[in-house]
């Protein structure tokens, strides 16, 4: 048991998940307290020591002056001079105690002018609160509370709206700059493409128009505005330096408002406040862009994980395309036991940081999934049903709990709960967890993922945690899965198969591609079959299925093997290609002519291969094979002249038909590729 696992066990023991956010807030507060105390404590102690020494010095000097005034005979007889000396002593005392500024505050004009009152109102609804001026009367304080309660929500809504508007305006300006000659020269052009070389239909024109304003440029604009506003403050407030002005502006736009620095020019308060408001709008825009980017990152990770699940699900059914009958196996033999034994072959020793990365990947994945799920009122009921399903009482079945089902002559006893799963209406009475329509499929996908070699990158760990999440089945039911398409490119133009291009799927730019939709070929259908929970082998390896299927999971057309092969050609037939079609690439010598066999039997071709042949003006190509005892009557294929082929040769030069056909294997069992069937079933057309 590693250190990280011990920490996880302790957190589960004290139920840390219920109040960890509050503990994080307390920890952040303690960190801030330590940080500020570390930098401010010693300096404050020094200031207090100096102030204490100065206070004692002031006391002594003040006492000496009073004694001097009392003992001086001249001052005793001259009252005017005595009052003057006393006033000088009091002014000196006030200056030493730093009380002159406070006295000057009350000696100046009232701050409750129109500009000062507007500045105070702005402090309230922006939640800055500098602490000057302040309301002293009871009526003023009551009005302050009511004004803040109504003004703060309105200002937050306005700030969000102005942030979006500012983002749109800056985005338009950014587009104009990019389209200009200066922008094309200065800013690089980004080309978006998928990894497999095909176009991404999701990257439509509308989504490209919705591309947000770049975050780095927004942050640079915010920094420029902070520096500009700080320089303006330095011009109006003569006692401020540039770092102090930057500090004041950042504290203001973050709505902290410590109040240690205040404006001393009442005439410029409104203009200064407008600078702060625009800074708040820029900061809100940056937060909005960052939040949108995080949301899009979550959506992207979610879509990638869903696509991986779809591909792996298609691989599961692709490896097991046939549904066969088999005698019944044991009932309720804990089907997950063999899966655990097959996947957990060895325990890998992992360090603390690897466990920490797994924990972080799990938390991020939980956040991504939770953001996609809708808040439902029956969440507690689902948790109770899940706990009931995981209880060991489910494995205890009696003979009364079993039903007998038949499928094409194969008889099998299954549990009532498993059989009831074929009907959605009976789902509430079953022992299957709610929303677990993908149970069998997800078990196979998890087994495939665990068999793969583990990678240390964050994306792989996030996908593994994505599959292990308990809410995956529920989110698969609520998510509208996108349509995927398998794309195969064919270079042999003679047997070209052209199908209608799917507008929603991916398609290649160059060449001929035939795509078939694979979406919904692996998804379990409600009311179609019951998941085979009682089968041990099917859950683990996916090589047998005992389901009661009313409709095939995969189209039989794609699962049907062809009875024809590209090697089943008659050796007596010579395929002749017109000479005018054989146009080589400019600057390249023509390919050497091949020597095809004109004999009727491949055995005679082997015995008389030293025979000389007359060169024919037209190149003769014959698919050849070695001698076999199972010769089958083959079809006669002859390629005719086609203008499209001629055009393709002019553009591409050599085509695969210009070379000898690949030699076949010496094995007597010929592998059927379905090539000839595709030529008979599909029309020949050239794109």
UniProtKB/Swiss-Prot annotation:
One of its GO terms (cellular component) is plasma membrane. Residues 661-687 are annotated as: Disordered. The keyword Zinc-finger does not apply. Residues 112-132, 242-262 dip into the membrane without crossing it. It is a multi-pass membrane protein. InterPro entries: 2pore_dom_K_chnl, K_chnl_dom. Its main location: membrane. It holds the Pfam family Ion_trans_2. It comes from the Eukaryota. The keyword Translocase does not apply. Belongs to the two pore domain potassium channel (TC 1.A.1.8) family. This is TWiK family of potassium channels protein 12. It comes from Caenorhabditis briggsae. The gene is twk-12.
């Amino acid at each position: 048991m590693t250190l990280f696992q011990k920490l996880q066990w302790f957190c589960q023991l004290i139920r840390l998940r219920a109040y960890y956010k509050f503990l994080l807030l307390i920890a952040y507060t303690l960190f801030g307290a330590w940080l500020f105390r570390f930098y401010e404590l010693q300096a404050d102690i020094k200031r207090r020591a100096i102030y204490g020494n100065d206070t004692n010095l002031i006391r002594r000097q003040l006492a000496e002056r009073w004694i001097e005034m009392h003992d001086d005979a001249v001052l005793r007889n001259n009252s005017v001079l005595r009052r003057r000396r006393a006033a000088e002593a009091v002014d000196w005392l006030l200056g030493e105690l730093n009380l002159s500024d406070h006295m000057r505050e009350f000696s100046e004009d009232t701050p409750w002018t129109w500009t000062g009152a507007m500045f105070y109102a702005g402090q309230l609804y922006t939640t800055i609160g500098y602490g000057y001026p302040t309301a002293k009367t009871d009526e003023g304080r009551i009005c302050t509370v009511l004004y803040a309660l109504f003004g703060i929500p309105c200002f937050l809504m306005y700030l969000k709206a102005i942030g979006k508007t500012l983002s749109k305006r800056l985005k338009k300006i950014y587009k104009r700059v990019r389209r200009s000659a200066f922008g094309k020269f200065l800013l690089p052009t980004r080309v978006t493409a998928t990894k497999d070389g095909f176009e991404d239909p999701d990257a439509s024109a509308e989504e490209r128009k919705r591309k947000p304003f770049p975050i780095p440029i927004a942050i640079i604009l915010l920094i420029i505005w902070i520096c500009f506003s700080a320089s303006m403050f330095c011009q109006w407030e003569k006692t401020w330096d540039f770092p102090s002005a930057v500090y004041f502006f950042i504290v203001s736009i973050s709505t902290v408002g410590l109040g240690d620095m205040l404006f001393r020019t009442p005439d410029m308060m409104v203009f200064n406040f407008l600078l702060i408001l625009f800074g708040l709008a820029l900061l809100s825009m940056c937060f909005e862009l960052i939040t949108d980017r995080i949301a899009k990152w979550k959506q992207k990770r979610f879509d990638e994980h869903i696509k991986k699940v779809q591909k792996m699900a298609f691989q599961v059914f692709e490896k097991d395309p046939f549904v066969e009958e088999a005698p019944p196996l044991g009932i309720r033999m804990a089907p997950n036991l063999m899966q655990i034994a097959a996947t957990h072959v060895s325990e890998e020793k992992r360090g603390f940081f690897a466990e920490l990365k797994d924990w972080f990947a799990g938390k991020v994945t939980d956040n991504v999934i939770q953001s996609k799920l809708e808040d439902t009122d029956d969440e507690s009921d689902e948790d109770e049903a899940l706990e009931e399903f995981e209880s060991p009482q489910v494995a205890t079945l009696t003979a009364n709990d079993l039903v007998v089902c038949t499928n094409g002559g194969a008889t099998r006893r299954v549990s009532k709960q498993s059989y009831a799963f074929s009907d959605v209406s009976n789902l509430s009475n079953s022992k299957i967890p709610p929303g677990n329509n993908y149970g069998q499929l997800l078990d196979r996908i998890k087994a495939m993922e665990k068999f793969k070699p583990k990678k240390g990158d964050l994306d792989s760990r996030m996908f593994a945690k994505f599959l292990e999440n308990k809410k995956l089945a529920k989110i698969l039911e609520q998510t509208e899965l996108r349509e995927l398409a398998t794309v195969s490119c064919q270079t042999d133009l003679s047997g070209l198969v052209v199908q209608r291009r799917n507008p929603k799927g991916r398609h290649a730019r160059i060449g001929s591609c035939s795509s078939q939709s694979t979406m919904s070929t692996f998804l379990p259908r409600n009311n179609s079959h019951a998941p085979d929970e009682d089968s041990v082998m099917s859950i683990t390896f996916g090589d047998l299925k005992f389901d009661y299927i009313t409709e095939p999971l995969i189209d039989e057309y794609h699962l049907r093997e062809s009875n024809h092969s590209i090697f089943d050609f008659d050796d007596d037939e010579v395929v002749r290609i017109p000479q005018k079609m054989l146009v080589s690439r400019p600057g390249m010598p023509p390919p050497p002519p091949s020597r095809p066999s004109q004999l009727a039997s491949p055995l005679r071709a082997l015995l008389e291969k030293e025979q000389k042949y007359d060169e024919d003006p037209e190149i003769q190509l014959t698919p050849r094979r070695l001698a076999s005892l199972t010769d089958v009557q083959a079809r006669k294929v002859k390629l005719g002249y086609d203008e499209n082929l001629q055009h393709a040769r002019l553009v591409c030069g050599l085509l695969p038909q210009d070379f000898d056909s690949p030699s076949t294997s010496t094995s007597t069992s010929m592998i059927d590729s379905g090539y000839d069937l595709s030529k008979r079933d599909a029309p020949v057309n050239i794109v």
